[in-house]
Design a protein with these regions (language model features):
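WD40-repeat beta-propeller superdomains and closely related acidic/aromatic-rich repeat-like regions
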Residues: 1-339
Length: 339
């Protein structure tokens, strides 16, 4: 008999602010949450899930990133500031300020570099908070950042394509050009393929190894979410209320039929693949949180826990814990398992 995926509620609490972003500690025992009114909150899952406000950004907090295998995490906000925090004592310091909102943060896989997206500029800091380089000239505001696995290359999605920068001395940059506004940047786990969802309702792929590029059309709305399965076999994409999964086996997506995952009755607001394990989670304005296993014949598991629009989803590094937040500021932490 095939195992059946399960979602079990572990902790539920009221944050008191609209949840904008979140990040788990490497061991999954702590989660930090950015609030729309500026709060930075820490939730210990070993202490009954109490939310502790440890600091703030004026105007609103916008992004969080936790150092892989480390104790540091970064936050940014509408005040243009980037704060570097030590989770062992909640001390923080400002390592960067900008006159515009700072919306994008991402640590490299080895935790030694932090990428910061400010409008059209990309700043790179080391883990001590010292700025290493500034890369300007992106066409339009940076919409997403993603580090190539096991490398010092970071992709920045913007208008007209995705720019990939190898952080070295000097910085080596390459433009993967495509007309239109790129909204996402997602690396296949082996680093061989870069995918981006576009405003015009297409998905574009660049094979970094062969140089080949391809495009998938047919979406009825902008492709706002993309993500790879942990084994690199599937790329999930979401537009409007539907999810389309492309299989990257054999000849790649051109030689396979797309898998359509239909379960939402309103626009999908969040979609995320588990870093480990076969799971894909999606949530939407229909107040539904669905757990899928692309490539399996299961129907999705409906968490059936929410009465408001879900605006935040985040997996722990081991893929065993899932955090969801709704627009009223309620947080739910769930354990992902099988029966």
């Amino acid at each position: 008999m095939n195992s059946v995926p399960l979602l079990q509620r572990r902790v539920q609490l009221a944050l008191g602010e609209y949840p904008v972003d979140a990040a788990f500690s490497p061991d999954g025992a702590t989660v930090v949450v950015a609030g729309g009114e500026g709060g930075v909150f820490r939730v210990s899952l070993r202490a009954a899930g109490k939310a502790e406000r440890i600091g703030e950004h004026s105007g609103g907090a916008l992004a969080l990133a936790w150092q892989p295998a480390g104790a540091l995490f970064a936050s940014s906000g509408q005040d243009g500031a980037v704060r570097l925090w030590d989770s062992r004592n909640t001390d923080s310091r400002v390592i960067h300020t900008h006159r515009e909102w700072t919306e994008h943060l991402s640590f490299s896989g080895n935790g030694k570099l932090l990428a910061v997206g400010n409008a059209t500029r990309l700043h790179i800091f080391d883990s001590a908070g010292a700025e290493q380089t500034l890369i300007a000239g992106h066409a339009g505001n940076i919409a997403a950042l993603a580090w190539r696995p096991k490398s010092t290359e970071v992709a920045a999605a913007c208008n007209g394509g995705v720019r990939v920068h190898r952080i070295a001395t000097p910085v080596v940059s390459h433009s993967y050009d495509w007309k239109g506004a790129c909204l996402t940047a997602s690396w296949r786990p082996d680093g061989s393929v870069l995918a981006s969802g576009l405003q015009d309702g297409t998905v574009h792929f660049w094979n970094i190894v062969t140089g080949k590029q391809s495009e998938m059309k047919g979406y009825g709305a902008k492709v706002a979410h993309t993500g790879w399965s942990a084994n690199g076999k599937y790329l999930a994409t979401a537009a409007d209320r539907g999810i389309i999964v492309w299989e990257f086996a054999g000849r790649g997506p051109e030689g396979s039929e797309p898998i359509q995952l239909n379960g939402h009755t309103d626009r999908i607001t969040q979609m995320i693949c588990a870093p480990k394990g076969p799971y894909l989670a999606s949530a939407g304005r229909d107040c539904r949180l669905l757990l899928w296993r692309p490539g399996f014949a299961d129907e999705p598991v409906d968490a059936d826990l929410f009465s408001d629009e879900i605006v935040l989803l985040h997996f722990s590094a081991d893929g065993k814990t899932l955090l969801a937040g709704d627009r009223d500021g309620n947080l739910t932490v769930m354990v992902v398992g099988v029966s």
